[in-house]
Every structure is written in C-alpha cells, then in structure tokens.
Amino acid sequence: MVLEDRKDGSSLPGRSGSFSKSSPSELDVVDPYKRISSPGSILDAEKVEKKPGGWRAVSFILGNETLERLGSIGLLANFMVYLTKVFHLEQVDAANVINIWSGFTNLTPLVGAYISDTYVGRFKTIAFASFATLLGLITITLTASFPQLHPASCNSQDPLSCGGPNKLQIGVLLLGLCFLSVGSGGIRPCSIPFGVDQFDQRTEEGVKGVASFFNWYYMTFTVVLIITQTVVVYIQDQVSWIIGFSIPTGLMALAVVMFFAGMKRYVYVKPEGSIFSGIAQVIVAARKKRKLKLPAEDDGTVTYYDPAIKSSVLSKLHRSNQFRCLDKAAVVIEGDLTPEGPPADKWRLCSVQEVEEVKCLIRIVPIWSAGIISLAAMTTQGTFTVSQALKMDRNLGPKFEIPAGSLSVISLLTIGIFLPFYDRVFVPFMRRITGHKSGITLLQRIGTGIVFAIFSMIVAGIVERMRRIRSINAGDPTGMTPMSVFWLSPQLILMGLCEAFNIIGQIEFFNSQFPEHMRSIANSLFSLSFAGSSYLSSFLVTVVHKFSGGHDRPDWLNKNLNAGKLDYFYYLIAVLGVVNLVYFWYCARGYRYKVGLPIEDFEEDKSSDDVEMTSKKSMK
C-alpha cells in the first residue's frame, strides 16, 4: 500500500494522513519569477516582461566565469615549469605539490555546494569565492615579483648550485594555493546552477535558453583552455613570469567587477537545504527500523509513504527491489505521521522517492570509482609530459620555441576535432548496428575511454624509452635530446580520445542516472573523481620514487630523466589501467540503468493500480 496525493492535491480517500498543496507564500519562495496564477492577464504579462534573469543576466555570469577561468587556469597552466625553474623543486616534489593541491581543490566543491544549498545561496557563495580566488592569484603573483618570496636564480655555469625555497617562500606559495582552492570550492559547484536559475524552465523559451547556456558555457571553457595554454604560457615562458601572472590576476579582478555589475539583473533562488542531509535521513531512518520484516512481494500489508513530489522533479522513480533494506525508511508505522499528514520526524520516515534517490547513488558508486585510475593516467601525463618536453627539441622554425606547458593543446584540438565526428558520423553508424539511440551505451563509452587511457600510457612509455636512448647516445651534458617534441603527440592524441569518451561519458552518465534532485551530487562526484585521481597519482609517485631505486641505481623518477626509468612508471599506470578495466567490466555488467516515468504518466498509472486494487478487495 502507498500513501500518495491526487493530481488536484487532495488526499486519496480511505488513506491515513493528508498532503496538501503549498500555500501561495510557499510557492513564492521556490518561484523566483513570482508569476500569478491567471494566465494571459495584463498584470501577468507585465511581470513576465520585467522579470529579472534571462540572457541579460547570464551574460554577466558567463563573462565572470570566462575571466575567472582565464585567471586561475592561466596562472596554473604552466605551474609545473614555475615550480621546477623558479622554485627549484625536483620534478617529484613539484608533481606532488600539484597533485595534492589539485586533489584538495576538487574536494572543496563538496563543501561549497553544501554551504550554498543549505545556508547562503549561490550568489553569495560565488561572490565570496571570487574574492578568495583573487587573493590567491595576487599571492602567487607576489611570489614571482619579490626576490624575497622565491629562491635566488641559479648559476648558469653550475646548475647543481640551485637552492630550494625556504619556509617563508614555500609558506606564501601554499597560502596562495589554499586561497585558490577556497575560490574553486565556491565557484565550481555554483556557477552552472546559478546560470540555470536565470531561465524559467516552465516555458519553451526557458528550456531552449538552458540548453544554449550549456553550449556557451563549455565553448567558452574550451576557448579559455586554448588561450591559457598558448598565449599566457608563452608570455610566462618567453617574456616574464611577473607579467605572465599579472595578466591572469588583472583578468580575475575584472571578473569580480563584472559579476557584481549584474546584481540587479540576477534571479536569486533561496537555499532549500542540501541533498546530503536527505541521504543521511534515509540511512538513519532505515537503521532505526532495521528490525521490521518486509514481505517478499508487495502484498498490501505494508504502507509506504509516497507523497506528491516537488515541482522541480520531472520524473517519478519506481520502488525497486534492489537494496530493500533501505525501503524500511519509507514504511509508515504508528506515530510516524502528524495529523496534518507530513512526517513527524524526517529522521524516522522518508518518502519512496527519497529512498530510490539514495539507491541510485549506491548503484553509481562502483562505476564512479572505476573512473579514478583512468583520470590518474591523465594527471600523470599532465605533469611528466612537461618534464619530457623540457628535454626535447621544441623549436618550430628558426625563431619560435614551443612552451613545454602548451603541448596539452594537442589533446584539446583532438577533442575539438573528434567530437563533431563522433556526433555526426560515429553515432549514426553505430546506431544502425546496435539499434541504440546513442550508438553505444554510456557505460560502453566510458569503457572505451579507459582503453584509450591504457594505450596512451603504453605509447608514452615507448616514446620515453626512445627519447632516453637517443639522449644518452647524443652525450649532451645537459640531457637534451635531438628529438622533436612532436614525438609526444601520439600519447596526447590518445589521451584526448580518452577524454572525449571517458570524461564526457561520465558527465552524461552521472547527469542521466541521478534524479533531477541530485544533479548537484553528480557534479560533485565528478570533482571527487579528479580529487581521487590526484591523490592516487601523488601516492604512486611517492612510493615509486622511494622504493624503485637502490644503493647502486637511481629510482625511476629521478630528477635526471636519462638516469631514471620514467617509461617503467608509465607501464605501471598501464597495468593498473588493465586491472581497472576488468573491475569496470564487472561493475558495468551488473549495473541496472535508472528507470523513471514522467510525473503525469506515473500518477495515471498509480490511479489505475489503485482502482484495480480496490476492485479486487471489494470482490473478496
């Protein structure tokens, strides 16, 4: 038996408890557009015409987001080179600094999302985070500007005389990185939802606006990556670190000004509470009722709490037989409901929809965990490819030298070229073979990306072995290799294909398999994947650096690439990738895709079931 509401908001006859519609004042809280109920009236038309939000507001948000990314990514695009050349850190230490900071940066959005959803709202969170990002950029710029805040330059005649940073210098550097992490924690989880808030999705124009906003958002993000990894990196490498850092800092200051310039145009949606508390409530309620016995099949002897769901939710989830222990959280027992209908204690009674949402999360976690190692391959290539490039011929013509930090543009170009081909050619071709609307399933797309990550590591190991042999044979005392840097292109192209399949596949998978109410968790899980991959990469680097060497031989990740065995490290990541692929295949084989019905269809279906059940009982 299920307790629920009719479409008109009244309770079903003969059921205990009533679930009334929200009052107009309550609707005003969720509806930022404050529309009145009489459609077509002059007053209503005036309100719609003068409402805030829309593309005028979004232009300020996109401008802020573009300039913020130009600032933060522009500063850090070449950071591996900055740490090794200016702060004189060994490549292992520099890689660990970047990996640990990147992991922390990808954890902070979880905190930012919780604070935004529960307490202060998205505007205030982004505003505070923008100032934190600006402080971080200013701090990092100061480390390049003042001699007291970075180690003295090396003697060109004696490279081994380079001294490392002192406690003050490394402390100021880490302080700047912490500010940047705080900024990312507020901006990343809130910028997209705040942009979506500006559109009224109850209208066709609003739905189209949201779709267009996503296109513009990701297009500007790609453009920013290309600009930062070419123009900004070139200025940092060939002109000056001070100018190369000052430009991103100035752009971030402009981003803050632009964000506040749109204050009068924004739609402000009040925080409704975090989904994390809802997850905890389901788990606690199920534990409190753990001694309840559920029948093997739904025979009508158990009453489940299933009220009308929020208007923001577009589909109703079926009660599934998987993880049935959680169903106890939705079982109604004596004292669970107030006389008015709602639960007396949300930590003892949850709705069927809330329980099914938690089940979706549990089903997705194994798939999510399989993505960490493939992302670790990306992290590894992003750090050590720069070290390889610094020892290779980067000349493009007689006068231009390619910055080592700009090589990742090859992966970006691969993504930009391949995605239209994937959408226009690959998907229609595979659709004719498989009959699937997307050509291949989302899990097949993610698995293909994992395969490309493995091949990328294998190719990277082969190229590094060739580079080391040529460098040793050349006998250059500086370790330079008479080998074009474009030999690194194959591994970068393969990694670009990995991103096109794996990362975009994960984003689509999380957003399609999570209920609408839990989309914030989908984005948080993706950031958490990068955090896990960063910490895993840092752990592997530390362990290999410590244990791969001996008394008479250098370790694999020696600061002298020719003395080390970086190719062995790449092969190690490839082997872990193969193990991860087997684990992913095992998890994907047993995964059941989310099944839901539109609200109208579900309620009509439930009404039919109720009539049928009532008639059967009357016949008895």
Swiss-Prot record:
List where the protein spans the membrane. 70-90, 95-115, 126-146, 167-187, 213-233, 241-261, 364-384, 402-422, 443-463, 485-505, 524-544, 568-588
At the top level of its lineage, which domain of life is listed?
Eukaryota
What the record says about the induction of its expression is: Circadian-regulation. Expression increase during the light phase and decrease during the dark phase.
User: Null mutant: what phenotype?
Assistant: No visible phenotype when grown under normal conditions. Growth retardation when starved of nitrogen.
Low complexity bias: start-end ranges: 10-25
Q: Where is the signal peptide?
A: none
Coiled coil located at which positions?
Answer: none
Task: Give the GO biological process terms.
Answer: nitrate assimilation; nitrate transmembrane transport
> How is it modified post-translationally?
Ubiquitinated by NLA. Ubiquitination of NPF2.13 leads to its degradation by the proteasome.
Known SUPFAM superfamilies for this protein?
Answer: MFS general substrate transporter (SSF103473)
CC per GO annotation: plasma membrane
Q: Which UniProt keywords apply?
A: Cell membrane, Membrane, Nitrate assimilation, Symport, Transmembrane, Transmembrane helix, Transport, Ubl conjugation
Family as reported in the entry's similarity comment = Belongs to the major facilitator superfamily. Proton-dependent oligopeptide transporter (POT/PTR) (TC 2.A.17) family.
- The protein depicted here goes by the name Protein NRT1/ PTR FAMILY 2.13
Q: Which organism is it from?
A: Arabidopsis thaliana
